[in-house]
């Protein structure tokens, strides 16, 4: 079962506004991205999982806890991109304007190994379905 996390009200308003804009302007996407989504994911994961955030733009990892460093990714899509391997990877997916789910919370190496080839921008993509399969395999192992 996937853990669901309520989004803080200011974040929910952002996603509700994008849904309203998409309804007003059919065929246009108003997808939050970049630093905004990264920062949202970091604070949501930190609160939900008891993580301590590093200062902004910490290379490789966004947070830590008693077990070590954590990289955090948030998406509303079907995949994430990674620049490098990490110790622990937490991936969240926005499932509604009010809620996100934890898709993956585990070791970074299996995700890095399963990610696609390096792209021109230096990133490797991995689908959420692959991450779910990795999580399920490590849970049953």
What annotation goes with each model-predicted range?
Residues 1-67, 73-141:
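Nucleic-acid endonuclease domains
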């Amino acid at each position: 079962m996937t853990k669901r996390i309520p989004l803080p009200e200011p974040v929910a308003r952002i996603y509700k506004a994008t849904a309203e804009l998409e309804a007003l302007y059919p065929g246009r996407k108003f997808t939050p991205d970049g630093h905004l989504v990264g920062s949202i994911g970091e604070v949501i994961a930190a609160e939900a999982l008891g993580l301590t955030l590093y200062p902004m733009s910490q290379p490789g990892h966004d947070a830590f806890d008693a077990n070590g460093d954590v990289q955090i990714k948030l998406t509303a899509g079907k995949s994430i991109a990674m620049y490098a391997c990490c110790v622990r990877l937490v991936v969240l997916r926005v499932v509604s304007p009010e809620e996100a789910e934890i898709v993956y919370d585990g070791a970074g190496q299996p995700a890095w190994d399963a990610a696609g080839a390096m792209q021109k921008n230096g990133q490797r993509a991995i689908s959420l379905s692959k991450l779910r399969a990795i999580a399920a395999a490590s849970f049953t192992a």
